[in-house]
A protein has these predicted regions:
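HIT superfamily nucleotide-processing domains
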Residues: 1-173
Length: 173
């Protein structure tokens, strides 16, 4: 299930119109209609007691991951101090693994929540030749996709994900 804006095509699984206010409420648990409460949000790399890391499988961006908080929370400040630290440790761990295994030109981190108001962080390895670089993944396309580069990055993801799972501290998430 793709819940982030698909470049140029909109969003495939948004809640019904008018439901965003209800989805944005703090309080944990699960919220009906929230795609991250009702589904994984992508291919699960690992899932812990507090959060999961998924591979978002966004076309043109083979190394697009999300760190998704398990309980429904709309804002980072809805978490207590210990959970905020834990969440950022997970974001940092994903970023470090992407850097170590893929050597991207840049890592993009984003926590918007405007489309899906369930706390999640986008962690995206970016390469100078990608279709939108140096703009954000949601910016207009600047060039054609380099199929060879996309395939080369995608081929390295399984090893990177195994390393992510083996990283010390992963089990605490």
């Amino acid at each position: 299930m793709n819940v982030a804006p698909t470049l140029g095509t909109g969003v495939s699984s948004l809640p019904p119109e008018g439901a965003l206010a209800a989805l944005g409420r703090p309080g944990g648990g699960s919220v009906q209609g929230c795609p991250f409460c009702e589904g994984s949000g992508g291919r699960v790399v690992f899932e812990g007691a507090k959060l999961r890391v998924i591979h978002a499988e966004e076309a043109g961006f083979p190394a697009f991951y999300r760190v998704i908080w398990r309980e429904h929370a709309a804002e980072f400040s809805d978490l207590d101090a210990a959970d905020r630290v834990l969440c950022m440790e997970a974001v940092t761990m994903v970023e470090q693994c992407l850097r170590e295994h893929l050597s991207p030109d840049k890592i993009n981190l984003a926590a918007l929540g405007n489309m899906v108001p369930h706390l999640h962080w986008h962690v995206i390895a970016r390469f100078a030749g990608d279709t939108h670089f140096p703009g954000s993944v949601w910016a207009p396309v600047q060039r054609e996709a380099d199929a060879e580069q996309l395939a080369a990055v995608a081929a390295r993801l399984p090893e990177m994900e195994r390393a992510m799972m083996a990283r010390p501290g992963t089990r605490s998430f």
